[in-house]
Amino acid sequence: EFTSSTGDTVMIDEGALVEGTIDEDAVGAFGGEIVDTIVKQYGETRARVFINEVASLAMRAIMHFGFSIGIDDESISDAAEAQIDESMDNAYERVQELIDTYENDDLESLPGRTVDETLEMKIMQTLGKARDSAGDIADEHFDDDNPAVIMAESGARGSMLNLTQMAACVGQQAVRGERINRGYEGRTLSHFKPGDLSAEAHGFVEDSYRSGLTPREFFFHAMGGREGLVDTAVRTSKSGYLQRRLINALSELETQYDGTVRDTSDNIVQFEFGEDNTSPVKVSSSDDNEIDVDEIADRVLAAEFEDEGEEFAGEQATNLSESADDRMDRDRPSSHGAAPIDVPEVGDD
């Protein structure tokens, strides 16, 4: 029993799905609860079989029912668009109230912040809530069988934020965590007056990707997108270099039979592996789902010695030498009744 990414309870009893939906949290590459439990209780071999079976089942389901996504899957009703427009108007009014309070020197600064920083922070919070509100409105008008919603909620691809930006509102564009302030002297673009502090003058994109961005919104969006591209390139190079240094530094370390970690010169790096002599792979990540070692041992022993008809689910021990000898014995022709082989003598024509 565990909780899925959508907050629903997933319960599996004796291999049968009793409650909930299987999503990325159940069989995902990182932190899949079902796969993790199978590895700990039944071994890696059974987990590999399970992953292959799930992949085959998913492919058969997609081939049978079909799954596709198009531009119409991000469309919302006129009533939803009217609600979103009303939410945006309320956000603009709230931002203008903050600006008026700031210009009248009535805005109180937050602890540890200047008045200017307080204004920017409150405007960002207001516009963020407006985008979230637009996303909630759009989400209410999407059907449960919408392909985009299925992908987002199952964790297959994308998120509800991506769906919000496609259908409702892209939201505030940020550079270095702040509203866009760079551009011309005293203003971001020549389309705005100097000193304009409004939402649209500092990178707020009201439109959605489906409805299309205005030229000014597109320019601000490109500024935010450029930061993402540069950050991705820099982060990749830094993390790659860090990984290379770690590999070079740790490549000579190995765990000895006495539990210590040593290098090739037999210098002790750790008296116990990980300071607790415990493999993280075999440790439960949840206090609610502790590993019952006694139950696993009883089940394995029962399967091995009591019921010979039950297939052992764990990893079978193999002896490569014996396996090769058996294969050679099977392939070697029998000597009983075999026809004699003529071997020519040296010198015969």
UniProtKB/Swiss-Prot annotation:
Its main location: cytoplasm. Signal peptide: none annotated. It catalyses: RNA(n) + a ribonucleoside 5'-triphosphate = RNA(n+1) + diphosphate. The keyword Chaperone does not apply. Keywords: Cytoplasm, DNA-binding, DNA-directed RNA polymerase, Nucleotidyltransferase, Transcription, Transferase. Residues 306-349 are annotated as: Disordered. One of its GO terms (cellular component) is DNA-directed RNA polymerase complex. SUPFAM superfamilies: beta and beta-prime subunits of DNA dependent RNA-polymerase (SSF64484). One of its GO terms (biological process) is DNA-templated transcription. It is found in: Cytoplasm. It holds the Pfam family RNA_pol_Rpb1_3. Residues 324-334 have a biased composition (Basic and acidic residues). It comes from the Archaea. Part of the RNA polymerase complex. PANTHER family: DNA-DIRECTED RNA POLYMERASE, DNA-DIRECTED RNA POLYMERASE III SUBUNIT RPC1. Belongs to the RNA polymerase beta' chain family. This is DNA-directed RNA polymerase subunit Rpo1N.
